[in-house]
A protein has these predicted regions:
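Short, positively charged interaction helices/loops
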Residues: 22, 42-75, 97-128
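Core beta-strand-centered patch of the WYL/Sm-like small regulatory domain
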Residues: 94-173
C-alpha cells in the first residue's frame, strides 16, 4: 500500500527540486520517489539542515517499492533517533546540495550504469532517443555549461560524433 508523506524543508531545496523537475520533465511524485530510492540507503548529510530560510512543504505518495523499503532505509541510515519526517528532510537537503550532474545520476542510475559499462567495454549499444532507436558507440560523459552543468553523452553514430543531453535518452539496451 502506498504511504502518504509530508516533508518540510528550506525554500532553497524546493527551488532545486522545481528546477530539476522542469529540466527532466518529471512529475513531482516521480522525482520525489526517485530521490528517495536513490538516496534512501546512502549516507545522508546534515549539511544545510540548519538553513534559516522560508520553509516549504510537499505532500506526495511513496511508490510501492519505496513504501515497502522505507522502514529499512530508516534503520540502515543509522539515524534511528530521527523522525521519518526529519529523515526525509535530510534526504531532500542532501539531494539539493549535490552538483547537478550527480543529481542526474541519482535520477537515471540504470541508464548511466548501462552506458558506463558500454564505454568501459568499448561496446555499441542501442538507445531510444527522440522517438528513435539508435545504435551508438558511447565515448564519454561530459559536463555541458549550456545546459546548467547537467550531463551530456559524447557518442558516435556511423563514425560521426555527437553530443547529446542524457535527459533525452529514454531507454538503453
Amino acid at each position: 500500500m502506498r504511504r502518504k508523506i509530508r516533508v518540510t524543508f528550506p525554500k532553497l531545496v524546493q527551488e532545486v527540486l522545481q528546477i530539476d523537475q522542469e529540466y527532466f520533465n518529471l512529475k513531482k511524485e516521480t522525482i520525489y520517489n526517485l530521490i528517495i530510492e536513490g538516496l534512501g540507503f546512502q549516507e545522508i548529510s546534515s549539511i544545510g539542515a540548519d538553513i534559516i530560510d522560508e520553509k516549504r512543504s510537499i505532500n506526495f505518495n511513496l511508490n510501492e517499492k519505496n513504501s515497502k523499503l522505507f522502514s529499512e532505509m530508516l534503520k540502515k541510515s543509522g539515524l534511528n533517533e530521527l523522525s521519518e519526517a526529519e529523515f526525509l528532510k535530510r534526504i531532500f537537503i542532501t539531494y539539493a546540495n549535490l552538483h547537478p550532474s550527480i543529481r542526474e545520476r541519482i535520477l537515471y542510475k540504470d541508464i548511466f550504469l548501462r552506458i558506463e559499462e558500454a564505454i568501459r567495454k568499448k561496446k555499441e549499444i542501442n538507445i531510444y532517443y527522440k522517438d528513435k532507436l539508435e545504435k551508438i558507440k558511447p565515448i564519454s560523459f561530459e559536463r555541458n555549461k549550456e545546459n546548467g552543468d547537467y550531463t551530456a553523452l559524447r557518442m558516435k553514430i556511423y563514425n560521426k560524433e555527437y553530443l547529446i543531453e542524457m535527459k533525452e535518452i529514454e531507454y538503453v539496451t
